[in-house]
Regions:
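Terminal leader/tail segments of proteins
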Residues: 1-93
Length: 93
């Protein structure tokens, strides 16, 4: 499975976990050099799973908050802890 943004493969792996309609990739499968931590919002701080959003930056073009990872997931979301999910701007398939 691949995560693609504007013809750029951000992540690729067969080791995918699906939760809530989103596909989560292991960090080892993600082009981390294209991700920059986004500043946390009040809503982010309220998330019970310790969410951290990332901007995807490719070729100097910033796509704000298009990726996220749960840093401290509660039991129901533990299988996706430390894995990256992507918003609808990113095609996953």
């Amino acid at each position: 499975m691949k995560a693609v943004l504007e013809n750029n493969v951000i992540a690729e792996s067969n080791d995918i976990v699906e939760r809530g309609g989103y596909h989560y990739f292991p960090s080892s499968a993600v082009r981390l050099e294209w991700l920059e931590k986004a500043p946390k919002t009040d809503k982010d701080r309220e998330c019970p799973h310790g969410v951290q959003f990332y901007d995807v930056v490719i070729g100097g073009v910033r796509h704000p908050r298009n990726a996220w990872v749960y840093e401290a997931p509660r039991p129901a979301m533990e299988p996706v802890g430390g894995r990256f999910g992507f918003w609808e701007d990113v095609q996953v398939g």
